[in-house]
């Protein structure tokens, strides 16, 4: 078998521990520091609207929350309502000692206030009890980190531990296929998918469906659910997000069942019930299978039902967003239904996990993370691919089709764009806008301002145009949202403008999409699945904003081909062979040689991570040209403390002044050419017991900022090396570093 039960449990336990550790690190940080970083914000209650939305007033000069982000709203007693009194208390200590009440919260919108020093924030998902306190006392509320979904992982651990369950054995204990079994039947939009599925399900219990962007996955699943309900079947639709469930139940095929109060949903919120008053709450979130009824539940709750199930409760289970399910969740679904339909897209985003890529690669856990892909490539269940996209133009489908073996076909009624805006391709091609972006800067002011100007220009031409502004990074999105409120002529971010991270928009359809790629940690923005999601949202045009030099960066072949198309073939890809002649001489070019293959592999480098060198003071003293020796392939960070120490060394008599001057010139040149940058210490990241005034500890705190990547402290200081290794930070001495370059 590919994975033992111990393998599954070890991965899930590792992810559980990682989430707990990251959450603990966050909440044990001083609350005032979290506020300065944007991980906590405070607002004064203004009003409770009829639709269940709660409005708060927040200072503009604070870090405002991103739209559609989850928080824990905490009401602190007495003087602790003011952040100025938080002192040295951590967020956890504040909640433990001073919290009177709390509620889950979701930031739904941002808006300007009559007072230019403040903005308004709309919050939903507030509990009824908490809302009553707000209306009565009108307090200041602090919003902090939301709790991680630990119960979901614990449910999956219980499922993989159960070796006696016959139905999960066929999924969990599979033998890997020697070849890729994924060869789906292509389904056109005019074909009756329900009839095809009904025929296959007579002799098969499971079916897998791939739904590329805009192919009508949700519409098809709503139609299938309605047909099954008419047959008197009990049906469960489960998905990762509540939003996916709400989008499904809003489809017209389910209206009669909604009106008949035959559709229930777990964890129904006030705003959801306002939007869909006939949707019934599953008040205790218990498994409620019943003939002719549709149950809606997220993975977090359906996994609990699967854990506790002794007999299979539902006739049919439809797993939407299956590509966002961990493989044990795929197994959990077969405990819930006699017939299973998985629908997802293995070329879009997999589940988000906090366990590092290096750990996942080391233990070969990729197949557990990308569960739907594992299912599709190793099992020979009947499979289908929806090949007609209603969203994309012919040219848009040609670009996105690169990710689908060019099998994507456009049936959109829109093929050309009626716009006078110069940068929008009138024929539906994606557009590439190259700018000069500073390396390492995730919130470049000029680029963000230009993006907002473009959004305003589109809205001035069509005020109802649906626009998405997407980026990989949360700080980028937070800054764009904030600047839109401050810079735009609008009083708030309109409902038809969505500014969000890519991982939160799978399934979104808009008219125009602007995908902003900051010149920082590029490999994450250019990751194939994420790039595909970001560039396949728009019906009319996708605009990619990035650094001019982007095409010179390393990226996967499909992404490069897409970008080449987006630049109207200004760049071309060579064929596998090319003939060059000069006079009587002829040469066949068969390919290219990657010279990096002949370089010695550095032992401190980790593949799949961004490798970042943090250089200690003693290294510059002994090797002034160290930045050149590292090379421009890797990011180099100079802690501000190092520059301060180098400056002080000039006052000593027994120091090589020429070496210091050379080091200073090289650092200045590296800063000018953007090969390197300076960073201040963040002593809040240091563990308890570390001397926050110690220079070594301050240098160490710079490395801790990049703990999610592979920070490498280059130092000859044995004590600093020991401290770094104790915190899991890679270190290498100057001697060892230079030796491996020989």
For every predicted segment, state its role.
Residues 2-7, 11, 61-202, 258-266, ...:
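Pre-ATPase regulatory/linker segments immediately N-terminal to the P-loop/RecA-like helicase/translocase core
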Residues 220, 224:
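Hydrophobic positions on the alpha1 helix immediately C-terminal to the Walker A/P-loop
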Residues 256-301, 500-501:
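Inter-Walker segment of RecA-like/P-loop motor cores
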Residues 231, 239-243, 300-319, 323-612, ...:
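Conserved helicase motor core of SF1/SF2 NTP-dependent helicases
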Residues 209, 237:
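Hydrophobic anchor at the beta1->P-loop junction of P-loop NTPases
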Residues 243-273, 483-491:
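Conserved helix-turn-beta segment of the N-terminal RecA-like "Helicase ATP-binding" lobe
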Residues 217:
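Conserved lysine of the Walker
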Residues 1-88, 470-478, 482-485:
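Accessory interdomain/linker segments of ATP-dependent helicases and helicase-like nucleic-acid enzymes
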């Amino acid at each position: 078998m590919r994975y033992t039960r111990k393998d599954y449990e070890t991965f899930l336990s590792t992810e559980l521990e990682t989430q707990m550790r990251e959450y603990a690190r966050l909440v044990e940080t001083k609350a005032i520091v979290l506020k300065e970083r944007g991980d906590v914000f405070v607002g004064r209650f203004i009003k409770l609207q009829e639709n269940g939305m709660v409005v708060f007033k927040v200072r503009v000069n604070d870090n405002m929350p991103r739209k559609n982000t989850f928080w824990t709203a905490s009401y602190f007693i007495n003087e602790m309502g003011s952040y100025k009194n938080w002192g040295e208390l951590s967020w956890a200590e504040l909640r433990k000692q001073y919290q009177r009440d709390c509620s889950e919260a979701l930031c739904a919108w941002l808006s300007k206030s009559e007072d230019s020093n403040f903005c308004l924030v709309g919050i939903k998902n507030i509990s009824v009890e908490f809302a009553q306190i707000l209306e009565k006392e009108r307090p200041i509320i602090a919003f902090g980190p939301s709790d991680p979904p630990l119960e979901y992982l614990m449910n999956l651990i219980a499922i993989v531990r159960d070796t006696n369950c016959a139905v999960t054995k066929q999924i969990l204990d599979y033998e890997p296929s020697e070849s890729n079994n994924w060869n789906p039947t292509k389904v056109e939009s005019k074909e009756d998918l329900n009839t095809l599925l009904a025929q296959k399900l007579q002799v098969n219990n499971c079916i897998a469906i791939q739904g590329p962007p805009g192919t009508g996955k949700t519409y098809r699943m709503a139609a299938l659910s309605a047909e099954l309900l008419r047959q008197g079947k009990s049906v469960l639709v489960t998905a990762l997000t509540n939003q996916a469930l709400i989008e499904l139940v809003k489809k017209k095929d389910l209206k009669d069942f909604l009106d008949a109060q035959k559709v229930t949903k777990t964890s129904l919120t006030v705003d959801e019930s306002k939007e869909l008053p006939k949707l019934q709450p599953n008040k205790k979130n218990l498994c409620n299978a019943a003939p002719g009824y549709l149950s809606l539940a997220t993975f977090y709750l359906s996994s609990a039902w699967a854990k506790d199930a002794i007999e299979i409760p539902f006739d049919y289970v439809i797993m939407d967003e299956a590509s966002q399910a961990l493989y044990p969740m795929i197994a959990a679904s077969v405990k819930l239904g006699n017939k299973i339909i998985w629908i997802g897209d293995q070329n879009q985003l997999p589940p988000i996990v906090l366990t590092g890529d290096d750990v996942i690669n080391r233990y070969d856990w990729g197949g557990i993370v990308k569960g739907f892909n594992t299912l599709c490539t190793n099992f020979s269940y009947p499979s289908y691919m929806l090949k007609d996209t209603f969203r994309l133009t012919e040219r848009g489908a040609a670009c996105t089709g690169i990710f689908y073996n060019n099998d994507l076909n456009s049936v959109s009624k829109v093929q050309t764009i009626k716009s006078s805006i110069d940068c929008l391709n009138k024929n539906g091609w994606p557009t590439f806008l190259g700018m000069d972006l500073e390396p390492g800067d995730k919130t470049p002011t000029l680029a963000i301002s230009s993006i907002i100007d473009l959004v305003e220009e589109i809205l001035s031409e069509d005020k109802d145009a649906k626009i998405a502004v997407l980026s990989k990074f949360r700080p980028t999105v937070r800054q764009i949202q904030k600047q839109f409120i401050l810079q735009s002529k609008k009083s708030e971010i309109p409902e038809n403008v969505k500014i969000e991270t890519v991982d939160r928009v799978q399934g979104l359809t808009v008219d125009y999409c602007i995908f902003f790629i900051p010149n920082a940690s590029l490999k994450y923005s250019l990751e194939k699945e994420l790039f595909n999601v970001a560039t396949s949202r728009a019906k009319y045009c996708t605009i990619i904003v990035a650094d001019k030099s982007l095409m010179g960066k390393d990226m996967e072949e499909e992404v490069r081909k897409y970008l080449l198309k987006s630049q109207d073939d200004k760049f071309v890809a060579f064929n596998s062979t090319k003939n060059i002649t000069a006079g009587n001489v002829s040469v066949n070019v068969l390919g290219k040689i990657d010279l990096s293959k002949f370089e010695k592999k550095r032992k401190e480098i980790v593949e799949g991570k961004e490798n970042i060198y943090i250089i200690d003071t003693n290294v510059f003293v002994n090797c002034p040209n160290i930045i050149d020796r590292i090379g421009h392939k890797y990011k180099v960070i100079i802690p501000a403390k190092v520059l301060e120490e180098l400056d002080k060394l000039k006052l000593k008599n027994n120091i090589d002044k020429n070496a210091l001057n050379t080091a200073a010139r090289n650092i200045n040149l590296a800063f000018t050419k953007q090969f390197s940058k300076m960073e201040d210490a963040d002593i809040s990241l240091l563990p308890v017991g570390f001397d926050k005034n110690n220079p070594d500890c301050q240098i160490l705190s710079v490395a801790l900022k990049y703990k999610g990547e592979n920070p490498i402290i280059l130092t000859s200081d044995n004590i600093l090396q020991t401290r770094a290794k104790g915190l899991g930070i890679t270190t290498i001495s100057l001697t060892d570093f230079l030796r491996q370059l020989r």
